Amino acid sequence: SHLDHKDKNQVILDVNRCGRCLPKELLIERINSIQDSLIRVLLRLLVTHTDLCYYQGLHDVVLTFLLLPLNENITFAIMNVLVQYHIRDCLYPDIGRTKELRINDSQLESFITRSECEYYFSLSWILTWYSHVVYDRDDLLMLTDLFLASHPLMPIYVATV
């Protein structure tokens, strides 16, 4: 199929698990439809951007848009821009780029190391645009609006306050 990708099985597993995160008032047919759309959007993104890799949590960002009254093509168009600019750094094959802190700001890197703060303490917040920790839909949409209208590092800035 034109939507084959090495991460297809992981995408399907994650999307199937996210069914319990959907609003309770949705009918099972609507849930199935949203999950099918979610898989198609994610695979289209991965096939379109062959240099990028799927990460667990990307489906949560896409789901935020699919739950709005947007169709699948509009959701893909939004995500197509986001994966190129706002969340691109999350889509590389490894976290090697995070080591650039040592090169670019050794004083900050030294402080973080001394504080014994693991780099991943807020990683899921940033990777999912807070969808795992912000349970109120209106609050999540407000954060999403902020992230769309701001510098791509805004999710990190929010994590610091």
Task: Label each region the model flagged.
Residues 1-161:
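Helix-rich, well-folded core regions that mediate interactions or catalysis
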